[in-house]
């Protein structure tokens, strides 16, 4: 008689959790002709090497100096067409799937109702060009609506940004939860003082600070950082990494007759 053997019941298998991670790449604040060309080339190469599934621009791809209220003597003569053209060239080079408008593009929408027919017409034409570029790229274009504008990537909000202070990353995290933004041109990571412990990521800019005349007298301009963001995301998570493009430290020339 063979001994009776008892087989152990097989342990139930847990259902496989497939996160479906994908790569993303993003920039902010290129400001058309004010772009730092070396940093821009480095960003495009980094994008190509990383081969992201999803690319975004967080806004201020144009500078729109001619439309700036409170502008100086030279701003009003800033030609509209070269500024718009160079900004759209950058978008075509980047080929993003998501284009957010920033506060600089928002000037165009604001001047649609200008009492000056020429200004209103110029704004209308510029906006049409932006829409046409987004359509050619098959990209989603999101108009700037201040604190209400943005799109979700996993569990992080992508937005241009509205706060301009040294604690912007922390304050944005307290407003929105996990958030990736630009606007201040200064790389920063800040934790929100909330029970869910959110993180704000300021991804800097890709501008040449000495070219920005209206910021030449601000101490904070020295903190501007050329950078971009990359990382991975899935339906319910996002893992950003900010990459800083190192620049040489500016030096003052010696006195000629010293």
What are the functions of these language-model segments?
Residues 233-258:
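A short C-terminal boundary segment appended to hydrolase-like catalytic domains
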Residues 120-155:
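Metallo-beta-lactamase
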């Amino acid at each position: 008689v063979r001994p009776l053997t008892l087989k152990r019941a097989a342990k139930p298998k847990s259902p496989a959790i497939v996160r479906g991670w994908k790569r993303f790449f993003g920039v902010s604040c290129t400001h058309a002709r004010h772009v730092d060309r070396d940093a821009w080339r480095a960003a495009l190469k980094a994008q190509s090497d990383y081969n992201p599934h999803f690319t975004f621009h967080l806004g201020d791809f144009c500078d729109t100096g001619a439309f700036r209220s409170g502008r100086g003597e030279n701003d009003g003569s800033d030609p509209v067409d070269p500024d718009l053209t160079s900004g759209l060239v950058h978008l075509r080079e980047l080929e993003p799937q998501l284009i957010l408008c920033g506060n600089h593009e928002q000037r165009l929408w604001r001047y649609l109702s200008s009492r000056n027919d020429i200004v209103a017409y110029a704004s209308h034409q510029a906006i049409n060009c932006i829409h046409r570029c987004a359509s050619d790229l098959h990209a989603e274009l999101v108009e700037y609506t201040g604190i209400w504008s943005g799109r979700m990537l996993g569990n992080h909000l992508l937005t241009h940004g509205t706060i301009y202070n040294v604690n912007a990353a922390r304050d944005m995290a307290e407003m929105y939860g996990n958030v990736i933004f630009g606007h201040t041109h200064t790389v920063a990571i800040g934790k929100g003082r909330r029970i869910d412990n959110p993180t704000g990521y300021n991804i800097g800019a890709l501008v040449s600070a000495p070219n920005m005349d209206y910021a030449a007298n601000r101490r904070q301009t020295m903190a501007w950082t050329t950078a971009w963001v990359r990382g991975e995301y899935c339906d319910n998570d996002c893992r950003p990494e900010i990459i800083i493009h190192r620049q040489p430290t500016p030096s003052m020339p010696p006195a000629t007759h010293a």
